[in-house]
C-alpha cells in the first residue's frame, strides 16, 4: 500500500508529522508504531516495515517534536515530559483516527526513541500488546570528563543552549548505504538542546531504577559494540523489568544503529518471532491488585517505613530536616499549617494552591516562598491545571456528541 504523510495534534496544539502505511492485506486491526533515534526522523525508520514483512499490520512512524518535518527548534522540545506526552497523544490519535486499539499495537523504538517509549511505558502504563527496544540511550557516552556536570552548570548560567553530536555515521553502522544516507540527509539535525540531553539522563535514571513498574511484554536488543551508549543501564533495566514476558538479545559486533546494521537480519529474525508470538496469544497483563501486600511495591514501602538510626548520615540528615521544618514553622505560614494539620491535609493543599507566600516577618515570607516552590508542590499545582484541562476536554467532547455533562468530585 502507498505510504501517506499526515499530521496529528498534541495536547498543546502542536501538529506533528507522521507517516502511515496501511496494511498490505487491507486489514485494519493491528499496527506497528515506529520511533526513531535522536537527530533523525520517520523516513529513516519506515524501512523496518519492509524488513519485517508483515502484510497484516498497518505501520506508523512519527517525526518527534523538533525533528524531520515536525515543528519546533531543531533538536529541542519544551521538556522530556512533553515528548513523552507526545508519544501518548500519538497512540491515542491512532486509536481514534484508525480504530486500532492499544492492545493491538506493537511499538518498536530505537536509541532516544526507546528512552521516550520506556518512560511512556513507566509513566502511562499503556495496555499495548508488546514493545521492542533497540539500544535504548539510557546513558550516552560523553567522552569529555565531567561533561554532564559542566553542562548542568552552564545551563544554570546560560539557560537552554545547544550542543552538536560528535557521532559520525561510521560509528553508527557498518552498512555503507546507511552511512551515506545519514551523511546526505538534510532532515538530520546534529544539534540537541541541553535541556533535552540532561532531561534524557534524568528520565533514563528514573526509569531504569524503577523498571519493575513496567509490565508490558518486552524485547530488548543490545548492540554488542556500541560506541554511543553504555551497556550497563540497559542490562539493569532488563534485570529489573516487571514484565512476565521479556527477552534480551545481545548482538555481537553491532554498532548503535541496531536496526540499520549490516547484519540486521539477525535482529529482525528475533523481532518477527517475538511479535508473532505476542499476537498469536491473548493479551497478557500482570496482576498488580495485590502489589501493596507483596512484591516490589511492598518492599519499597517497608524500606521507606524503616526507622533510620540517628547516628547514620541519612538518619542525621532527616532528623535535621524535621527539626528545620519545626523551627521554620515559627515564621513561615505554610510550615505552620503543615505542622499543625499535617502536610497531607486539606488545609495544606488549599494553601499550596493559593501559592501566596506569607510569614510573620520578611524572613518568614522568604522561607515560605522557598517552601511553596518545592518541586512536590509545583507538581501538585500542575496536577490541578492538568485536571482542569482534562475536565474541559471531556466536557467539550460530550457537548459535541450532544450528551449531558456531569462532574463528580470524589474527595
PLM region spans:
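Short beta-strand/loop motif that positions the catalytic acidic residue
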Residues: 214, 220-222, 226
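Conserved alpha/beta-hydrolase
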Residues: 49-73
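Short alpha-helix in the alpha/beta-hydrolase fold that links the catalytic acid
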Residues: 216, 230-239
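Catalytic active-site module of serine/aspartate enzymes centered on a nucleophile-bearing elbow/loop
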Residues: 249-301
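Class I SAM-dependent methyltransferase Rossmann-like catalytic core
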Residues: 329-403
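N-terminal cap/lid segment of alpha/beta-hydrolase-fold proteins
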Residues: 1-23
Amino acid at each position: 500500500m502507498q505510504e501517506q504523510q499526515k499530521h496529528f495534534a498534541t495536547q498543546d496544539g502542536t501538529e506533528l508529522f507522521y507517516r502511515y502505511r496501511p496494511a498490505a492485506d487491507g486489514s485494519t486491526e493491528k499496527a506497528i508504531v515506529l520511533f526513531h533515534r535522536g537527530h533523525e526522523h520517520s523516513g529513516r525508520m519506515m524501512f523496518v516495515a519492509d524488513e519485517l514483512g508483515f502484510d497484516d499490520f498497518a505501520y506508523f512512524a512519527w517525526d518527534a517534536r523538533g525533528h524531520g518535518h515536525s515543528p519546533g527548534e531543531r533538536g529541542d522540545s519544551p521538556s522530556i515530559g512533553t515528548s513523552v506526552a507526545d508519544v501518548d497523544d500519538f497512540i491515542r490519535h491512532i486509536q481514534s483516527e484508525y480504530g486500532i486499539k492499544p492492545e493491538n499495537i506493537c511499538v518498536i523504538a530505537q536509541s532516544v526513541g526507546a528512552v521516550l517509549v520506556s518512560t511512556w511505558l513507566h509513566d502511562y502504563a499503556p495496555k499495548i500488546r508488546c514493545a521492542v527496544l533497540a539500544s535504548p540511550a539510557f546513558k550516552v557516552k560523553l567522552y569529555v570528563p565531567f561533561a554532564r556536570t559542566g553542562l548542568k552548570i552552564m545551563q544554570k548560567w546560560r539557560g537552554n543552549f545547544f550542543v552538536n553530536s560528535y557521532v559520525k555515521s561510521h560509528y553508527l553502522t557498518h552498512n555503507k548505504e546507511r552511512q551515506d544516507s545519514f551523511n546526505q540527509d538534510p532532515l538530520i539535525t546534529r544539534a540537541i538542546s541541553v535541556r533535552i540531553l540532561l532531561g534524557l539522563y534524568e528520565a533514563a535514571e528514573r526509569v531504569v531504577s524503577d523498571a519493575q513498574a513496567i509490565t508490558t511484554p518486552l524485547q530488548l536488543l543490545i548492540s554488542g559494540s556500541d560506541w554511543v551508549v553504555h551497556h550497563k543501564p540497559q542490562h539493569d533495566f532488563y534485570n529489573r523489568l516487571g514484565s512476565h514476558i521479556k527477552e534480551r538479545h545481545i548482538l555481537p559486533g553491532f554498532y548503535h544503529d541496531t536496526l540499520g546494521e549490516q547484519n540486521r537480519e539477525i535482529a529482525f529474525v528475533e523481532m518477527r518471532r517475538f511479535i508473532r508470538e505476542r499476537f498469536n496469544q491473548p493479551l497478557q497483563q500482570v496482576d498488580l491488585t495485590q502489589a501493596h501486600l507483596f512484591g516490589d511495591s511492598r518492599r519499597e514501602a517497608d524500606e521507606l517505613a524503616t526507622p533510620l538510626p540517628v547516628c547514620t548520615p541519612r538518619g542525621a540528615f532527616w532528623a535535621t530536616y524535621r527539626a528545620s521544618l519545626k523551627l521554620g514553622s515559627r515564621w513561615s505560614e505554610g510550615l505552620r499549617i503543615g505542622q499543625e494539620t499535617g502536610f497531607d491535609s486539606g488545609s495544606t493543599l488549599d494553601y499550596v494552591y493559593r501559592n501566596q507566600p506569607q510569614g510573620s516577618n520578611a524572613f518568614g515570607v522568604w522561607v515560605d516562598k522557598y517552601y511553596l516552590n518545592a518541586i512536590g508542590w509545583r507538581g501538585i499545582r500542575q496536577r490541578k491545571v492538568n485536571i482542569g484541562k482534562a475536565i474541559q476536554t471531556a466536557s467539550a467532547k460530550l457537548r459535541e456528541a450532544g450528551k449531558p455533562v456531569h462532574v463528580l468530585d470524589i474527595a
